[in-house]
Amino acid sequence: HNGLRVNLVPADELYNEFSSGTPDAGAYRRYLRMLQDRAEGNEANMPKYLLLFGDCVWDNRMLTADCKRLNPDDYLLCFESENSLNKIYCYVSDSWMGILSEGAGGSPTTQQQDVAVGRFPVSTPEEAKIMVDKTINYMENANAGSWQNTLMFMADDGNDNLHMKDADEVANYIADKYPDFQIKKVMWDAYQRTTSSVGNSYPEVTRIIKEQQANGALIMDYAGHASAGQLSHEQVVKLMDFNNFKNTNLPLWVTAACDVMPYDGVEDNIGEAAVLNPNGGAVAFYGTTRTVYANRNKYMNRAFLYRVLSTKDGKPLTIGEAHRQAQNDLVKGNVIGYDKEGKPITESDLTSNRLQYALLGDPAMPLNVPTLKVVVDSVNSISTSDASAKAMLKAGMVARIDGHIEGNEAFNGVVTATVRDSKELITCRQNDGTSDAFTFYDRTKTLYNGSDSVVGGKFSFQFAVPKDINYTDESGLVNLYAINNDRTIRAH
């Protein structure tokens, strides 16, 4: 699809050539290292992606009772850490297979990844078809629309508001780096919590998430507690939901939470359920395989989102390359900003925590990130290029917005606009008994949501300003998403 040269290599051939016929995950690395050596430094010939087309189990030899019933021919191997008993420090890592430097592999916590790695956790032809079809359909982008301009950030309560603080910080960071995306925040503690004989729940949060999942989003990002069977103690979204989702607009799910996708186990889990759901779920899943530290999850979450939304030479990074670069960022020290003196602020993680993160999906697939820019030329005939002028929207008036697609005068298609009111300070409810109420800023009021045509790269639309607006001098926000008629060019 993207002009890649692809090698399809049966696992048994790799074992024969690189591990003396014995099934060994190291054979995958040695094969990639051979390709790297043969490239002799020529970037065009270097191996870039490894798609592990097959599920795996922690018992690579399949000697235990749970694994004896499985057919080894239906599975690939995985790399398990030497410490395999501690839930926090043990890990399964596909990224290890992409560490190709001379003498590397023995200390993966401090070593950089050379090849982007992802996995299709499939063991039957039916499962394989599901993931292949999902990937092809996503790349063909038949369901393209403004839903692909939405990033939803979700955060659990508890832990002295840690998860909500982290999610809010990451969301604000991404909004600053990529202001053209529409950011939505769902903080558990901002909603009413109900209690019954089976425990606590957040019905409104569940409704909002399921509604967004049905409508679609580019990324659904969650920070908080989790297990293989549920997100948060309140079971806001459960394994059964991921099995039953019916949505054609497939997001990338990202979870900065414990144990969401232990794909080397024999029990069902949310990560695999999301990508193997034939009727919806996710096009790919980026999450953790074991218990992780919440304070370090923020580092990985921020680094991955920054990379996966970025572009290079006018093209979005692939999800596998984003994973590789994010992992390497935390080894080198990720620069997330600068202090008042201009010195870089960095985040690093040389622990096994970052190795808990894995990608279920095609590493060579990019997200459908818009690559062109939509420019607002004027609001109510007041030019946006005039810094001294300020367009005021008043309740009951008809507002007009004119704009164009930058660098493409031949663009014909549709533009979708979402106009939101000024930011509001939201104070949470302290449902979990925290000493201080968590507060965050969000845009909760939508003034207009609609579409209009783009002709010759230009557009204009009007809308009536509602009466229940925030009566302040603070700025509103216009998010725009445009797609051409043959659905091959996107802008925001």
Which positions does each model-derived feature cover?
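Cysteine-dependent hydrolase recognition
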Residues: 1-464, 472-474, 482-491
